[in-house]
Amino acid sequence: MNKDKNEKEELDEEWTELIKHALEQGISPDDIRIFLNLGKKSSKPSASIERSHSINPF
């Protein structure tokens, strides 16, 4: 468990440094949130999937 705690602390420190550097470069906290959420999968189907179901292949 101590190993897990150390890894979490290291990751927390790394994220803190990354965010600090981003803020120094003029990147807003909202921009950081948007960027981080780009990789998250939504429960909503994408537009291309919705369209593909409406096309009759025959």
Swiss-Prot record:
Q: Where is the Sin domain?
A: 2-40
Give the matching SUPFAM superfamilies: SinR repressor dimerisation domain-like
Q: Which Pfam families did the record assign?
A: SinI
Tell me a Gene Ontology molecular-function term this record carries.
protein dimerization activity
Reading the lineage from the top rank, the first entry is Bacteria
Q: Which GO terms describe its biological process?
A: regulation of DNA-templated transcription
Q: What does this protein do?
A: Acts as an antagonist to SinR. SinI prevents SinR from binding to its target sequence on the gene for AprE.
Q: How does it assemble?
A: Heterodimer with SinR.
| Protein name per the record | Protein SinI
What gene name does this entry carry?
sinI
